[in-house]
Amino acid sequence: MAFKVLCVDHVGVAVKDLALIKQHMKDILGLDPSLPDETVEDQHVTTSFFKPSPQTEACELEFLGSTTPDGPIARFIEKSNGGKNGFQHVALRVDDIEACLADLQAKEVPLIDKKWRVGAGGCHIAFLHPKATGLLLELTERPGGPSFNK
């Protein structure tokens, strides 16, 4: 393969009340967001990332709150999770997202994104269709990777 999966980057959790879950993370676990909240307008979502220790490369938790009652996250919570907060996706960090997508397309793996797009934190991201694995998987290349130099 022309790419490597480096680690689990983050786990995405869809939540009905982003402010409430942020307060729970602070009060119960003593965690503050590792990045400022970011709204992705075209996806109707606000994201809030938490990691156990800002000094490590530990896997983060991404909480996703819908900015509209009919946004993708709100629909996911209602349809897929019975109206409750829950697991939405796993993000895998890759060393070269363009090589990864080319390899997956050559293997005819179903993709939501055939080309990367900019996600939260300026990362280059793309999603595999759940038909590929039974899960929603996100591929993430962090700033500084090969696709940022093209």
Regions found by a protein language model. Name each.
Residues 2-6, 20-23, 27-28, 32-35, ...:
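Intrinsic disorder/low-complexity detector
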Residues 30-56:
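Acidic (E/D-rich), amphipathic helical modules within compact regulatory domains
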Residues 45, 56-58, 82-87:
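Short connector loops at helix/strand junctions that flank enzyme active sites
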